[in-house]
Amino acid sequence: MCIRDRYNRANRVAASIASAHGISLETAAGVIAALSPNNRWERNIVDAENIIRVYAIAGAEEAMNVKVCTYGKMKDKAIQILESPTMAHHEDILNGRKITAFYQCIIGCQDAVCIDGHAYSIWFGDRLTMKNVPNIGKKLYAEIVSDYVEAAEILREAGSLNRFANLTAYEVQAITWVTWRRLHGITK
């Protein structure tokens, strides 16, 4: 799989789950994002499908009994998203910058960027352990996102006739994130 396709693949997975269960892409993406903290991608998808399936068949109360590999609070958010009428409510429920950005990347918001400790290290230009990554407050988060957006713009301008012509900020983040983890042997 092309690294650049990471979020497009996530979008297709969310669309497939949405179609199978008669919900919107945004709702499926919201559930996936809600269940993502400390959850491997493959398990995240299994958990999202299970919650959505049980919710569709038996409702919120039964969906609360589904086992997931993330925090109980995040399962609560996933169910709230299933009960939520609009995309704006989904973002309010998700609440955090990183998890909301992950949701936006899945649904294809071009300038959304999911900033975690690895993305910070890439931006900072030095490998830091996660315990040495500072708290990424609102202002710093916005600065890092702005720099990823600018990097995408520079690459689009430089590569207007090649494969970078339509590069998004979230693709720059995904490419650098996966490459960084591979170069540094980071598996978790």
Predicted segment positions?
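HhH-family (HhH-GPD) DNA N-glycosylase catalytic core used in base-excision repair
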Residues: R4-K188
